[in-house]
C-alpha cells in the first residue's frame, strides 16, 4: 500500500536513491492523489480484510473484484505450497507496518508491506515479502521499495529467526496471474540498507535547502512519474542541451 506523508517514501526509493534533490523539490508541491491511487488503496484494504478474516466479508463485496480475488488466490496458493513442502509453522501478516526510520534516518518513517509470510521448517526459516500492484505499468520485484520492506522485515523478526532466504515478490494481476520473486539473503539486504542510509542522509540534508537544486539528476526512469518535472531546472537544462 502507498506510504503516507513520508519525506522519503519507500514507494519512490528507486528515484530518490538516484536523484537526491527530488524529495526536497517535491515537498514544495501540494499533496494530491489520483483516482487510480484511490482505487488501488481500496483494493489493498479489501484484500487485507479478506486475508485477515474472510468470514467478516459480505459475499457481494467481492463481486466485480477479479484483481483482488487473483491476489488473494496467489497468496493462498503460496501458503499451500509451503504446507505441501512440510512447513512446521506458518505465519501470515497482512498490511504489516514496518519501521524504516533506522534505515532511512527519517524520524518516524514507516512502510507497509502488503503481505509477509514466515515459513518455519525443521532446520531453516524462509520469509516472503509480497507487494501487490494494481496498475498497468509492469513492476520488477528487484526494486528498492520491496528490498527496503524486506530489510525492515528482517530487522523486525531478527530476534526470532535467522532466515535462510528472503523471497521478495510482486503480484500484479493486470500484468501477470503469477507471483514474481527474486531471492535474496539477509546479508545482501544489509549491504543494500547501508547504501540507502547513505543516500537518504544526503536527501534529508537537502530538505528546505536551495542547494537541493544542485543535486537533481534527470533521467528517463526517475523523471517519468515525478510530480515536479514540469519545473525541474535540471531536466529543463538537460532537454535544452539535447535540442
Give residue ranges: language-model regions:
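Generic detection of long, well-ordered alpha-helical segments
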Residues: 33-41, 62-72, 143, 186-193
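Catalytic cores of nuclease domains that cleave nucleic-acid phosphodiester backbones
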Residues: 46-146, 155-168
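Short coil/turn segments at secondary-structure boundaries
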Residues: 26-29, 59-62, 88-96, 213-223
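Active-site-adjacent bridging/hinge elements
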Residues: 15-21, 115-129, 197-201
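Short, histidine-centered active-site or binding-site loop motifs used for metal coordination
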Residues: 28-29, 131-134, 172-174
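Charged, glycine-rich intrinsically disordered N-terminal tails and low-complexity linkers that flank
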Residues: 1-57
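Metal-dependent nuclease catalytic regions and adjoining charged, substrate-binding loops involved
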Residues: 2-3, 7, 72-79, 103-105, ...
Amino acid at each position: 500500500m502507498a506510504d503516507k506523508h513520508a519525506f522519503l517514501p519507500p514507494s519512490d526509493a528507486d528515484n530518490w536513491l538516484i536523484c537526491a534533490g527530488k524529495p526536497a523539490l517535491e515537498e514544495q508541491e501540494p499533496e494530491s492523489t489520483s483516482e487510480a491511487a484511490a482505487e488501488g488503496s481500496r483494493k489493498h484494504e479489501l484484500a487485507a480484510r479478506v486475508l485477515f478474516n474472510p468470514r467478516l466479508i459480505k459475499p457481494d463485496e467481492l463481486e466485480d473484484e477479479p484483481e483482488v480475488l487473483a491476489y488473494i488466490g496467489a497468496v493462498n496458493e503460496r501458503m499451500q505450497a509451503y504446507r505441501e513442502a512440510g512447513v512446521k509453522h506458518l505465519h501470515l501478516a497482512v498490511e504489516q507496518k514496518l519501521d524504516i526510520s533506522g534505515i532511512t534516518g527519517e524520524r518516524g518513517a514507516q512502510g507497509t508491506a502488503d503481505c509477509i509470510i514466515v515459513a518455519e521448517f525443521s532446520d531453516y526459516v524462509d520469509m516472503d515479502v509480497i507487494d501487490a500492484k494494481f496498475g498497468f505499468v509492469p513492476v520488477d520485484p528487484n526494486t528498492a521499495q520491496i528490498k527496503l520492506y524486506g530489510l525492515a522485515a528482517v530487522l523486525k523478526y531478527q530476534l526470532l529467526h535467522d532466515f535462510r532466504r528472503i523471497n521478495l515478490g510482486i503480484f500484479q494481476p493486470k500484468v501477470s496471474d503469477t507471483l514474481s520473486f527474486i531471492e535474496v539473503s539477509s546479508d545482501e539486504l544489509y549491504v543494500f540498507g547501508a547504501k540507502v542510509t547513505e543516500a537518504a542522509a544526503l536527501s534529508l540534508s537537502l530538505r528546505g535547502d536551495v542547494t537541493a537544486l544542485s543535486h537533481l539528476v534527470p533521467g528517463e526512469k526517475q523523471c517519468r512519474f515525478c510530480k515536479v518535472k514540469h519545473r525541474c531546472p535540471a531536466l529543463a537544462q538537460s532537454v535544452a542541451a539535447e535540442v
